[in-house]
Amino acid sequence: MIFQSFLLGNLVSLCMKIINSVVVVGLYYGFLTTFSIGPSYLFLLRALVMEEGTEKKVSATTGFITGQLMMFISIYYAPLHLALGRPHTITVLALPYLLFHFFWNNHKHFFDYGSTTRNSMRNLSIQCVFLNNLIFQLFNHFILPSSMLARLVNIYLFRCNNKILFVTSGFVGWLIGHILFMKWLGLVLVWIRQNHSIRSNKYIRSNKYLVLELRNSMARIFSILLFITCVYYLGRIPSPILTKKLKEASKTEERVESEEERDVEIETASEMKGTKQEQEGSTEEDPYPSPSLFSEEGWDPDKIDETEEIRVNGKDKIKDKFHSHLTETGYNNINTSNSPIYDYQDSYLNNNNTGNLENCKLQLLDKKNENQEQDLFWFQKPLVSLLFDYNRWNRPFRYIKNNRFEQAVRTEMSQYFFDTCKSDGKQKISFTYPPSLSTFWKMIKRKIPLLSLQKTLPNELDTQWVSTNKEKSNNLNKEFLNRLEILDKESLSLDILETRTRFCNDDTKKEYVPKMYDPLLNGLYRGTIKKGVSSSIINNTLLENWEKRVRLNRIHTIFLPNIDYQEFEQKAYTIDKKPLSTEIDEFLTLINELGNEAKSSLNLKGLSLFSDQEQRRANSEKRTKFVKFVFNALDPNETKSGKKSIGIKEISKKVPRWSHKLITELDQQMGEFKDRASMDHQLRSRKAKRVVIFTDNKATKDAEEEVALISYSQQSDFRRGIITGSMRAQRRKTFISKLFQANVHSPLFVDRITPLRLFSFDISELIKPILKNWTDKEGEFKILESREEQTKREEKKEKDKKEDNKRKEQARIAIEEAWDTIPLAQIIRGYMLITQSILRKYILLPALIIAKNIGRMLFLQLPEWSEDLQEWNREMQIKCTYNGVQLSETEFPKNWLRDGIQIKILFPFCLKPWHISKLYPSRRELMKKQKQKDDFCFLTVWGMEAELPFGSPRKRPSFFEPIFKELEKKIGKFKKKYFLTLKILKGKTKLFRKVSKETTKLFIKSIGFLKKIKKELSKVNLIVLFRFKEISESNETKKEKDYLISNQIINESFRQIESGNWPNSSLIETKMKDLTNRTSTIKNKIERITKEKKKVTPEIDINPNKTNNIKKFESPKKIFQILKSRNTRVIWKFHYFLKLFIQRLYINLFLSIINIPRITTQLFLKSTNKLIEKFISNNEINQEKINNQKKIHFMFISTIKKSLYNISKKNSHILCDLSYLSQAYVFYKLSQTQVINFSKFRSVLQYNTTSCFLKTKIKDYFKTLGIFHSELKHKKLQSYRINQWKNWLRWHYQYDLSQIRWSRLMPKKWRTRVNQSCMAQNKNRNLNKWNSYEKDQLLHYKKENDSELYSLSNEKDNFKKCYGYGLLAYKSINYENKSDSFFSRLPFEVQVKKNLEISYNSNTSKHNFVDMPGNLHINNYLRKGNILDRERNLDRKYFDWKIIHFSLRQKGDIEAWVKIDTNSNPNTKIGINNYQIIDKIEKKGVFYLTTHQNPEKTQKNSKKFFFDWMGMNEKIFNRPILNLEFWFFPEFVLLYNVYKIKPWIIPSKFLLFNLNTNKNVSQNKNQNFFLPSNKKIKIKNRSQEAKEPPSQRERGSDIENKGNLSPVFSKHQTDLEKDYVESDTKKGKNKKQYKSNTEAELDLFLKRYLLFQLRWNGALNQRMFENIKVYCLLLRLINPTKITISSIQRREMSLDIMLIQANLPLTDLMKKGVLIIEPIRLSVKDNGQFIMYQTIGISLIHKSKHQTNQRYREQRYVDKKNFDEFILQPQTQRINTEKTHFGLLVPENILWSRRRRELRIRSFFNSWNWNVVDRNSVFCNETNVKNWSQFLGERKPLYKDKNELIKFKFFFWPNYRLEDLACMNRYWFDTNNGSRFSILRIHMYPRLKIN
């Protein structure tokens, strides 16, 4: 058995290997290509079928295979692939070839040479067959395109190592497939030829020449087929001549384009930015940028994709003199001003420099030369680029609109450029090589002889590089070790930490550049320093550097040999310096103005250097004189850069741009670009209409202002922003089945499309009635079932109704679209509607009125002329726009024939046969009126009425219906009366007849009877007779009693029915009457029967069985007589017997019917009772169970309780599935968990004896907290791979993320799913009360009076960062080996010996609600523009931004809101305080929450403040407002910034409520957010604030003291105003002019920082639009009151919406959930340090710990002896300052980040023996690792002390972990912030070596 399984396993693995091998996969792909049928197959087929002679067949197959081979080679060989893929290659191949082909087929005799004896291969026809098959192989595949196949091949090529093997095996597979295919084809053809059944076909026999004709015309058929196929795919390719050319943005750009780059292959260059070009400096990464580039000034976060800008100090600028932009054949020039003085001719120099005066050469070029060059230029252009101007959108490029740029960015410029460069001392291929540098290098090589370039051997390079690197790393190591040694000496100074050099602004005042802009601290930054520079400084610096900058750059001689430089130099050096110094001001102002005209819209932050007065000073003469002089030597751009050379310079990587600025159809319609109104649109946008709602006709200077909406077409948008005249991409595998279809569907998903109604039926619906019959008997089951069914039925009805409405709506829209799409349809429809309306109003309705009244007169009724005419006059026909916006009766909408029209009929006339007097309308009529829909309709084309435009025509109330109803009523009444009389008469006649009959019978019988009596009296005794009478009487009485009883029962049952309280009494009364009538008739009948029986009784004879009558029977005669009489008796009694039987049946049935409802109700009550009892008993059982367990308390927010947390009481465990969280998020969370307060039970756990007594449950719990003794744990080292991550998360989930956390993190559907594996254990709450997140609080910590802020720039904080790194490292790596951690190392007694007086406050380390460790101030993480580069994590719940109304629920539910900690100080009166706050909120209104005036009092009352999320209000009254980049709603800027950084932290409510206002402010404050432009903001002590250092300026206390101060805006605000005013003028006509400042601010803010969404649900939307329509009507009417009232009555217009408040507060909007605020996901270039902190979540310490006084320095120092014993100080420790134990977990933190990185990299490069495969080899092999105590000079063997190994892990841990994290989230490749992770791409950092 074992042997067999072994064999089987081998077999399987062998099979798997074979299947996965390259050869097999190649063969498989080769086979697949056989099925990609293309037009080439047509030729092959034709050759095989048609051509005679083997040569043609062979040539066909050869051509076919050759073509396929070429296609295969193109997969592997890129140039061929590119050549075949280019559109022009296909065009050039296909068009001429097709022409030739048609010619060939139609005029064959031209080429028919007859039979030749030459070599058959030279025969033209054979060559044609070969070419046919070859060329068509290279064309695109047609029927089954193999794009998928090609993609698969590419993927596999990317994956597999042996590419050539794959390609060859693929080709072999293809060859085999095609050979098989061709053989099969041949066999089929042979079979067809030989098959007699085909030949003997009747049709073929009858047409003898059919086959012959087919064969003759086959060539034609094939050519037609080919033509169709070619047209099919050539439709994509625009012809090179007929293409619609696009207009350029300006003439200068046209020139640029004409001089565009000569070679299509090198696509690095493209257009300049045209008139808006402005450049400064050069890049480090890209020293010679490509000529197609642009620059931008100022910083916009959105532009990071396009530019990478680096700032350097301006003084270094002069070094970079050579900064030319080169193309392969020449230079492009861009005019930088629109000045008419000097017109630039087409010239060769592309001059974008700022730092030097190369431009001079430009102006002095000889015009002759230029013209000659221009003539030459046409011939230089290759044919391809002439035919196919790749500059234009002739290819399927999508135009990406960009609001902030003039032109769109070119996409064909690759982000990656491959070239060789020196790296690690070796020549390597770099994929981010600057393309311009490589082209420049090629040009240099071409010009300069190669011998002159020094060649260095690779070995030399290598050794040299290694040696220098070694040297540097040794130096670094030495420095590092020196610092460590100083640490060992227990030095108190902080100099051991590496200090950073600051960039100084002013030496005397010791003023530093803000950290934000400091290139030394922060890396090269991209913002400009906004600091005005005096003109005197500019003059001096300009004069100093003048000569240097006017010099020529001699390197141009290499490239341009034919230029006469002498004349140039003479002109250049004749500059007179004196006039220059005096006239510099005028010159600069002039330049400013020139710049303003041509400046790009990017230049938001450009500053004007001089005041307006100074600028006005220059007179025109001086200007012209000076300009004439200057433009012969200078470029305005040049000088401009000169003026800026003092500030920080801007360097930018340029991006190629298109020269076109395209506008969409929509833009054209909306008239956005009025300057280009004459221009036609170039982008096809989705079909839309501009619907004008309202035009303002007031006489203003401007044109009429129109309020318009854009209404989009509902049909599917196949334009998709395509550029007119560009190539279309053919969409495959999609089909459109309907006339109007929103989306194209793939055939794969046909089953998902809703089926047709005809074929859809539900089997369950068919089965239900059958089941019903079976379940009738089981009463209880039946009742329950019916209840469920009822609800289901109702739901289904609603669903069906909704679907039906939806379908109708879709049909309506389809009709609307149809009218819109069909040409001229609107005109026809418009005229038809107008004619219909006229016909209706003036012909049809009056005719009907006349006819009706004449009819009434004929029927002798009074005519109703006045009433009818009144109603007719009441009808109004209002013209509406196509979308149904009302105008007026006379006014027609603009362009109504083109855009369409609707006619709305208000109070539509309805012809009534008579008018009822309206004095006392009946109740029923009133009900009817209420039910009636709104009294309006739309006129259709056929004159019908429809509820909605294009809706289905509604039913008109019929004229004759009420007449027929009235007739029916009258006939009914007449019938009733007639039949009653008939019945009565009938009854009476019957009675009379019966009575007469009976009397006659009785009379005859009585006579006979009397005779007999007379005879017999003498014989018979009298006594018998009496007895007989008794018997008969008793019988009768009994029967009577029975009937009485039954009647009584019936009556009772009726009484029961009557006794109920019925609402519709009238209806029930009538029913009751009917029933009583029926019962009375039954009674009467019964009485009648009884009477008849009584009449019968006298005929009963004397009983013959009596002994006395024996004598009678003796004679046979008498016996016969008796028999006879009996027989007759039976016969006539039978009739009555039958009647009685039927009567009985009738009564019994009636009774049972009446009793059914009673019985059913009884049953129902019984069953419900049972259910309730069952439910109660279950609940009791559950309650008992719950009471037995320990109750788990959850904090629920009352409003969300029902919807979000559907967790039943039974399943109240934490639901968590770790796979649903993003690892980065959990990582971040876990890193922030605080230090646990171990002191209380640390001593218990330190000894071996304890382990025996502790329960395993407690042990496990302690294990998760990491506070257990080493004896109780595994000793082996764990593997640090995936298991570790998983286990680590598993160990943490219980206490790190509370129930609320999990519920917030996980989506609803996952939350409700019960996850049994991760059940939270009900632990003893008293044990873990100080570290459990279950005790989330909204409450505040104890406040410190000191409100000094913590700033990141403080070097001393490195100590705290160490702690953060350490804690995180300790948690992750060491989650099991916690024994050796610093937390549980020292027994408690030892600590006591060391005189550590530690008093733990009860509130020590409770967690804040927010997940930031410690109670740190929010400003720790706030800087300008802190917006993380983050994207939404879909698994994370975001706040819904709906604000909870406190006013509604008053004080009831606040307990649910505020989770009050049970362990808190008993003195705090929390509840009362909270309620007070709520009361105050109610009084004050939404925006202004009270802030406590007296801090001492409030601290006494409660240490916890209600609205304190994450300790965000340090003191609420002490809130600082930062100088942020934006100030849209200054009240909550600070909070909002936090929200952007950590959106899961703060609920939206507190963005608005924790405001920095005092009582007196709140009362007086105006609720205007946007300041009008005329108001100037005057903030006190502005200058004072500017002088103060940031930390003081940001103090909240300042704000508190100034009671009546308006919100403090940043200084940036005024700059913004100024900039916007400037930028508006600079923009010119291209952009919209902002009317006020507010608009500008809003625009900037919305675009740059926030995303505001107005969200309303469908119902509100509908109402809104209805209102808009009504408003539009009212605005146009002269007397609108009547319509207004009626529309309000009809609920057409809702007053709540109509009431537009003048200043609607933001909170109201947010309360309603209408305004949603979200940060735009921006990619912000932030400093690396900050992102690092954000990702790992470094535990920053509370600001109270960071005091800059002497005490701080005394407390924090490092003790070498206790270096290992790092004891963390909880928040309120009192520390004995004599001895503090403090440790650096990560020693390399001594160095600052850049040096630290360098140290790691260098040490890494020097260790060549690292193992790539197992990156954790350091840990796995313990003996290889030396402990890091070598730094401290203490050497211990590793196996004795594991602590050292752990410390070693800490040493590199944070970055190693971060690397993993980065890889997990794919951050490290191809992202803008990739540089952050550059260090992380290195595998592992080896230990430092000591030489």
UniProtKB/Swiss-Prot annotation:
This is Protein TIC 214. Part of the Tic complex. The keyword Kinase does not apply. It comes from Solanum lycopersicum (Tomato). It comes from the Eukaryota. Belongs to the TIC214 family. There is a partial copy of the N-terminus (positions 1-379) of ycf1 in the inverted repeat (CAJ32441). Residues 248-300, 788-807, 1580-1607 are annotated as: Disordered.
